[in-house]
Amino acid sequence: MSNYAVYSDDGGITWHTSKTPACTNGDEAKVVELSNGNVLMSIRNRAKGYRLFSKSTDGGDTWSEPKLNTTLLDPACNGDIIAYTHGGKNYLLHSLPASPTTRENVTVYISSDNGETWQAKRRIFNGYSAYSSLQVLEDGTIGIIVEEGKWDGGLPGEDGFNLGYYRFSLKWLLEGDPVEPVAESAE
């Protein structure tokens, strides 16, 4: 299975496929345009352990060899990555389960250098959890939807999932504000 980028430069009138794959051992990739115009692809690593990243310097036409980022754990699970600008500073936010082997403890990581390093992280959900999706809200806070496993003593996840919705601020993420993210029921 390979990760190619399919993209449009004219609002969806025409579409292009990258000439080279970003990765041949991953799937469920997410892309984000960096503050310098390059494109970063975050790739689910089917081998588990750590997240894979590939970069394009030509708008998604060709991709670098994928590299493991040993800061971002990846239990072979989908995650999300978004660009976020606040106070004149550019950030990347990435949500993933914080385990190399088990889908649990969905956490948000933050980078201020276009994904080269990931300095801060805060856990959103404690326990069995998997896919997540991030969104910058109109008021500048960040919303996240998380698959939260229900567990009644069997194998994690076999009892199904609830969707949890949380909202948090950049301050909470960066400074460790003791206020937990605001949960809004999405059940």
State each model region's role:
Residues 1-187:
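Asp-box/BNR beta-propeller blade signature and adjacent active/binding-site loops
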